[in-house]
Amino acid sequence: MTILHMDIETLRNYCINKKGVTEELPFGPDTLVFKVMGKIFALAGLDAIPLSVNLKCDPEKVISLREEYENNILPGYHMNKQHWNTVVLNGHLNPNFIFQLVDDSYNLVEAGLTKKQQQELKDLDE
């Protein structure tokens, strides 16, 4: 299946199917939050037009992504701008690239979990 445009359901399905992920609305009905083992890795503004998602990013890549994808990858809205980007889902970015950014965010957060949390996450497979 080829996806040409990212919508909230596609983004949600991709995020929620990752291991150990829960979804919540802790900041009100307009911000969908995805967590791995209780730690945020993605926030989607449901009232944003166009749809956007905040994703954690390697600090060494954060600026270069913003420069390369100007107007589509921005400093993280209401987030630590050294570690978070806002990715605008307006059809200008390849969905597979967006999925890779989601994966990168998930992996960064997973790597920052305590050893106990990492083991609990690993045990979810068994």
What would you call each of these model-derived segments?
Residues M1-E126:
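Charge-dense, helix-prone N-terminal extensions
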